[in-house]
C-alpha cells in the first residue's frame, strides 16, 4: 500500500539474511509506504526507505504473518551493498528505526542503530520499542507516537558505528567511532552506555566505558576512562587512565588513577602522576616516628594510611621529582614545607 519501487530487480541469490527469489522477494517487499530506488535492492518494512544498489531490508512479513509487520518500521538505507537483517531475527521489533549511510554495512537483530561509513556491523543491539500498529488520524500523530516510543525505550538498542570496520555485538546505548574498533557483550549481559573512539580498540563486557585512543583493550570493567594508547584494563572498575604507553600496560585493580606517559598503578586506589610514575604502595603503610626512630605504633589515620599512595615517580628506576610551590601545612595530615622545617631548626 502506497509503496514505490524503481529499478531493475533481476538478481537471484544471497542478499543479507535472505535468499532472493526475484518475483517472490519483490512482491513481499511491497510493504506499506516503503520506498525503494536502485538496482536489485529490496525493502520489507513499513515507512522504510532504501536507496542504492544491492541493499536489503529484510523481514519475514508477507501480509499474513502478524508477528512481523513491525519489523524494520522507519528504517533507512542510503548507499550500496548494505543490509538491515530482520528476517531471521527472533525479535519482532528488529530493524525499527535503523539507519545506514555508506557501503557494505550490516545490522542484524538490532533497532535504533545508526551506521555511517563502510564495513561496519551492529548485531543483537536491541530492546523493546512499542512501535504503533495503526497510523492514527494523521502523519503528525504517527510521527508523534513514534517519537514518544523511541524516547520511552531509550532509543532502542541505540548503538552507533561511525567510520570503517567497526563491530558491535550485544551492546546498548553505545557509540563506536573510528576504524576497526570492537565492542561486545553477551545475551542478557549487554555492554551498555559506552563511548569507544579511535583505532583498533577492543572492549568486552563493559559498562559506562569511555575509551579514546588506539589499541586499548578493556574487559569486564565498569566506569572506566581511558584517553591514550596501548592501555589494558582487565577485571577492574573505576579506573582513570590519561596518557599513552610505549608498550601495553595492564591495570587489574579498582579505582586506579594513572596520568602521564608510561604510568602504572598496581595497587587498588593507587595514583600515579607524571611520566614514568608507578604507584606500588598499598593502603596500610605506617609512618616513621622520629621520636622513636621506628615505625609508629599509632594506628590512627594520621600515622597509618587508609588508601593507597600517590606516586610522582619510580624510585626503583631512579625517577624522582620535587613537589614545588607547597604552602605551609596546617593540620596533622597536611604536607610540611622546607620553610616550616627551618623554623623547627631555629
Where are the predicted features?
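Glycine- and small/polar-enriched repetitive beta-structure motifs of secreted/surface proteins
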Residues: 1-325, 333, 339
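Glycine-rich, low-complexity segments
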Residues: 340-346
Amino acid at each position: 500500500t502506497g509503496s514505490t519501487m524503481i529499478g531493475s530487480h533481476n538478481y537471484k541469490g544471497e542478499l543479507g539474511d535472505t535468499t532472493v527469489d526475484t518475483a517472490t522477494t519483490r512482491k513481499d517487499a511491497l510493504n506499506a509506504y516503503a520506498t525503494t530506488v536502485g538496482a536489485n535492492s529490496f525493502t520489507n518494512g513499513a515507512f522504510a526507505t532504501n536507496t542504492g544498489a544491492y541493499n536489503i531490508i529484510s523481514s519475514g512479513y508477507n501480509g499474513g504473518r502478524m508477528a512481523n509487520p513491525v519489523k524494520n518500521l522507519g528504517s533507512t538505507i542510503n548507499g550500496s551493498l548494505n543490509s538491515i537483517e530482520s528476517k531471521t531475527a527472533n525479535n519482532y521489533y528488529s530493524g525499527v528505526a535503523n539507519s545506514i549511510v555508506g557501503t557494505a554495512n550490516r545490522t542484524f537483530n538490532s533497532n535504533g542503530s545508526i551506521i555511517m561509513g563502510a564495513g561496519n556491523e551492529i548485531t543483537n543491539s536491541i530492546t523493546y520499542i512499542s512501535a504503533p500498529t495503526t497510523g492514527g488520524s494523521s502523519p503528525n500523530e504517527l510521527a508523534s507516537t513514534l517519537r514518544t516510543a523511541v524516547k520511552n525505550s531509550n532509543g532502542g538498542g541505540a548503538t552507533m558505528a561511525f567510520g570503517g570496520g567497526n563491530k558491535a555485538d550485544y551492546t546498548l546505548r553505545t557509540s563506536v567511532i573510528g576504524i576497526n574498533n570492537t565492542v561486545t557483550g553477551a545475551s542478557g549481559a549487554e555492554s551498555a552506555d559506552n563511548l569507544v573512539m579511535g583505532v583498533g580498540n577492543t572492549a568486552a563486557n563493559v559498562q559506562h566505558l569511555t575509551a579514546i585512543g588506539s589499541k586499548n583493550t578493556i574487559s569486564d570493567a565498569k566506569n572506566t576512562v581511558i584517553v591514550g594508547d596501548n592501555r589494558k584494563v582487565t577485571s577492574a572498575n573505576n579506573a582513570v587512565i590519561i596518557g599513552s604507553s610505549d608498550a601495553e600496560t595492564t591495570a587489574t585493580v579498582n579505582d586506579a588513577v594513572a596520568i602521564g606517559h608510561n604510568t602504572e598503578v598496581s595497587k587498588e586506589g593507587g595514583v600515579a602522576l607524571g611520566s614514568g610514575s608507578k604507584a606500588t604502595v598499598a593502603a596500610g603503610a605506617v609512618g616513621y616516628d622520629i621520636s622513636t626512630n621506628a615505625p609508629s605504633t599509632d594506628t590512627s589515620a594520621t600515622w597509618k594510611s587508609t588508601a593507597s599512595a600517590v606516586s610522582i615517580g619510580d624510585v626503583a628506576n631512579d625517577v624522582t621529582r620535587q613537589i614545588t610551590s607547597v604552602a605551609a601545612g596546617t593540620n596533622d595530615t597536611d604536607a610540611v614545607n622546607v620553610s616550616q622545617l627551618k623554623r623547627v631548626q631555629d
